[in-house]
Amino acid sequence: MTLLVTGSSGFLGRRAAAYLASLGHTVLTPSHSQLDITRESSVRVWFAEHRPDAVIHCAAISDTGICQREPERSHVVNVEGPVLLAKACRETGAKLVFCSSDQVYFGSPYPGPHCEEEPLSPGNVYGRQKLLAEQQCAALCPDTVSLRLSWMYDDQSLPGEHGHFLTTLLSALRDPAQPLSWPVHDFRGMTHVGEVVRNLPAALSLPGGVYNFGAENDRDTFHTVRALLERLHLQEPLSRLTPNQEAFAQNPRDIRMDASTLHAAGITFRTTLQGLTETLGNLL
């Protein structure tokens, strides 16, 4: 297959492009100057020339703080860009896989784990933009597969990347002077990016719809870390671990996802604790 991967310089996109190419696919990773997803003329010209069989749309402004401060600019990238790609996919017959986010569940009045059919009213700009993009892409191109991704980590950091949960935890584990404090009012899944990437080929075959696409978790972040340290018998860090009672205390965050729909389609992920235990255990 000829695949377009947008956001190929980002955390997910660069790994997705490399993995899909290793499977023998022709993977196209145009630069912004070659394909500006926010300009309809650029999208039309590029698709007319290259005609990919499928699009894996990873590009986004994913920093929730930037989205809050600059909602107009982030709307152009996070909503208008996917819409233009959906139009192009409809016109050329390409399959669209849209990378959405568990942030669509932020502010939900329902406790997690959340299922895809829940009525949603995201409590932050980024979540609202992702949900709107899901809806508009589905309306334009009903075969669109929207993947609601969780917080991702890797066992290595590539040049130019910011830190993630695992790098932050590793830094604290290696420095006894660093505090180890994690929130008790924050519930979310964490997924190894390698699992996401390895499941993308199967996602290309999913029928159009929305899918929770990541690791399940039945603990808050503090108790996830505590269980992880206990499983790995890391007694010294355990003695430093304290619960953060202030973060999210006024507005607890529960964006955990129920992956039953995905499991029924034959796609599975390790649980958050399983993935972190295996990954961190291999790094220590």
What is each stretch, according to the model?
Residues 235, 250-284:
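C-terminal amphipathic/interface module of NAD(P)-dependent oxidoreductases
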Residues 154, 181-187, 211-219, 264:
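Glycine-rich Rossmann NAD(P)(H)-binding loop
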